[in-house]
Regions:
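Soluble periplasmic/extracytoplasmic beta-strand elements of cell-envelope proteins
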Residues: 39-45, 108-112, 135-139, 149-151, ...
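Extracytoplasmic
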Residues: 37-39, 55, 104-108, 131-135, ...
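Aromatic-capped interface at the extracytoplasmic side
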Residues: 23-36
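Early exported N-terminus immediately downstream of N-terminal targeting peptides
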Residues: 38-89
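Soluble extracytoplasmic domains of inner/organellar membrane proteins
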Residues: 126-185
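Hydrophobic membrane-insertion alpha-helices, especially the h-region
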Residues: 8-25
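Acidic/histidine-rich
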Residues: 98-101, 109-137, 143
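Amphipathic, coiled-coil-like alpha-helical scaffolding segments used for oligomerization/assembly
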Residues: 78-118
């Protein structure tokens, strides 16, 4: 009898925990789902993990950010940023290819806009939730090396930390901004990812 009572109590506690978690996750997950609608990301894949190829990846990054900084700084929306990239994909690819040649390599390169899954990622004072994001992706050579990423719009990766915060605050809703700048939010992101795998 006591055993049955204990089992019932344990089951009740588990159900209560699951329901409480779901009620807290659902609104949080809704805010997470909105963030990709306001963010345009930048993703570079190096040829390999050799020191030389990783150094080349960073040189390509610096060159692309240098050449596009003003335009991304003046974009008024994610759509503006994405349209700029679409209209200039060939130019961006040429910038990348020239930087690769300049450094003594003959790797082919590709610049494209993709909608891809990113895991939960940290960037300076930001944590972005996992999800499907639109991004400018640049691949160098075999694209088998470690990647580099940042946020092109709002232009966090080409700003100082304070400037990036100001731009993010202008673009994101109050709930979204609070979520990505909360340094205690990672556990909730993990719960959301688990929730998405089970129910989505």
């Amino acid at each position: 009898m006591k055993t049955n009572k204990s089992i019932l109590l344990i089951k009740s506690a588990i159900i209560a925990f699951v329901l409480t978690t779901l009620y807290s996750v659902i609104p949080f997950q809704a805010v997470c789902a909105e963030i990709p609608n306001n963010v345009f990301r930048f993703h570079i894949l190096a040829n390999s993990d050799s020191e030389e190829d990783q150094t080349l990846k960073l040189k390509v990054r610096d060159k692309v950010l240098e050449r596009t900084k003003i335009l991304f700084d003046t974009a008024n929306s994610k759509s503006d940023a994405e349209e700029f990239v679409k209209a200039n994909l060939e130019t961006i690819e040429e910038i990348v290819q020239n930087e690769v040649y300049k450094n003594g390599y003959n790797y082919p390169v590709k610049a494209e806009i993709v909608n891809m899954h990113f895991d939960t990622r940290h960037y300076e004072s930001y944590t972005l939730p996992a999800g499907m994001y639109d991004a400018l992706r640049i691949t160098i050579g075999n694209a088998k090396g470690h990647n580099w990423w940042c946020v092109m719009y709002p232009s966090i990766c080409i700003s100082t930390a304070d400037e990036g915060k100001d731009r993010a605050k202008d673009v994101l809703s109050d709930d979204e901004y609070s979520l990505v700048t909360d340094d205690k939010v990672e556990y909730k992101f993990f719960i959301v990812e688990l929730f998405q795998k089970i129910f989505v």
